[in-house]
UniProtKB/Swiss-Prot annotation:
Binds 1 Mg(2+) or Mn(2+) ion per subunit. It comes from Corynebacterium jeikeium (strain K411). It catalyses: (2R,3S)-3-isopropylmalate + NAD(+) = 4-methyl-2-oxopentanoate + CO2 + NADH. Mg(2+) binds at residues 212, 236, 240. HAMAP family: LeuB_type2 (MF_01035). The record marks 129, 179 as: Important for catalysis. One of its GO terms (biological process) is L-leucine biosynthetic process. Keywords: Amino-acid biosynthesis, Branched-chain amino acid biosynthesis, Cytoplasm, Leucine biosynthesis, Magnesium, Manganese, Metal-binding, NAD, Oxidoreductase. The gene is leuB. This is 3-isopropylmalate dehydrogenase. Gene3D superfamilies: Isopropylmalate Dehydrogenase (3.40.718.10). NAD(+) binds at residues 272-284. Pfam families: Iso_dh.
Length: 338
């Protein structure tokens, strides 16, 4: 396996080291290439993501990302627009995959959370995030600002199909989330894609939630969700809420998937670079480790993915609430591999 590693900034380097420790404990065929991308490189020479970087990344089977950013030194939006979004768009990462599971040892803010285990499939390259908009008469009383949500049938259909495939292999329940009573044009396109693709998956039960209703149900009855599919903006909101109800983002892994598999998909923990605790060795690496499991499953190595998930489950369940070092967590997960 050829793996591109973007450790990034802050605690990204620390959690990535533990994720690689676990990966190398399972497989001896992994060839890694480190990429200096993120705030440090930007501050050093002003570079964000070059064509040469992209060409080199495309030569790999997958990308493992730690965390990007340093809000103390880089203005908001610079790295997002210049690095993270171009990676997503130019590598055609149409599917943003976010598993949400309440692990033993994790504390949900919900009084009676039940058994929470669902996946959010978020469209990743269209909607309001595609950069279609602008400003007229800026700084005047007549200023006009617009953001256009761009949806294509091709883009929606492939994400919907991915979600149906995942539902078929899980509990066979798919919930699509939108705001069709207000966003009638995009909503109609999404509904037709759901109905058309759904004919190929007769065993999958399909439900619909308005986005505002979904935020209520995710708090009041999250255990009823299996696979959720939604657009870019709504997915961004729901996945953060999903992280909260499952005990925080310390265990939240994610994948940015090219469904065509023409480009390497990218896997990363959801948390940020947390520069305030960087270097202290107290960051929880489990989200990065679970991102490796997500990556292996994507690449067809289900057996080792399951071993990692079971090892993290055992480690999380053994915690007593006391402090634990980043490297110690990685060592415990390796020791739990069976």
């Amino acid at each position: 396996m050829k793996l591109a590693v973007i450790a990034g900034d802050g605690i990204g380097t620390e959690v990535t080291a533990e994720a690689l420790k676990v990966l190398h404990a399972l497989r001896d065929d992994v060839e890694t290439t480190d990429y200096d991308l993120g705030a440090r490189r930007y501050l050093r020479n002003g570079e964000l993501l070059t064509d040469e970087d992209l060409d080199s990344l495309r030569e790999h089977d997958a990308i493992l990302l730690g965390a990007i950013g340093d809000p103390r030194t880089v203005p908001a939006g610079v790295l997002e627009r210049g690095l993270l979004l171009p990676l997503r768009f130019k590598l055609d990462h149409a599917v943003n995959l976010r598993p949400s599971k309440l692990y033993p040892g994790s504390s949900s803010p919900l009084a009676n959370p039940g058994d929470i285990d669902f996946v959010v499939v978020r469209e990743g390259t269209e909607g309001l995030y595609c950069g279609n908009g602008g400003t007229l008469r800026a700084g005047t009383d007549y200023e006009v600002a617009s953001e256009v949500s761009q949806n294509t049938y091709y883009g929606v259909e492939r994400v919907v199909r991915d979600a149906f495939e995942r539902a078929q292999s899980r509990r066979k329940k798919l919930t699509w989330v939108h705001k069709t009573n207000v966003l009638v044009n995009a909503g109609s396109l999404w509904q037709r894609a759901i109905e058309t693709v759904g004919q190929e998956y007769p065993e999958v039960q399909v439900d619909y939630n308005h986005i505002d209703a979904a935020t209520i149900y995710m708090v009041t009855k999250p255990q009823e969700y299996d696979v959720i599919v939604t657009d870019n903006l709504f997915g961004d909101i729901l996945t953060d809420l999903a992280g909260a109800v499952t005990g925080g983002i310390g265990l939240a892994a994610s994948g940015n998937i090219d469904p065509s598999r023409k480009n390497p998909s990218m896997f990363e923990p959801v948390h940020g670079s947390a520069p305030d605790i960087a270097g202290q060795g107290i960051a929880d690496p489990c989200a990065a480790i679970l991102s490796v499991a997500l990556m292996l499953r994507h690449l067809g190595d289900d057996a080792n993915a399951e071993r990692i998930e079971a090892a993290v489950l055992a480690e999380a369940g053994s915690r007593d609430g006391g402090p634990v070092k980043t490297a110690e967590v990685g060592d415990r997960v390796v020791a739990n591999l069976k």
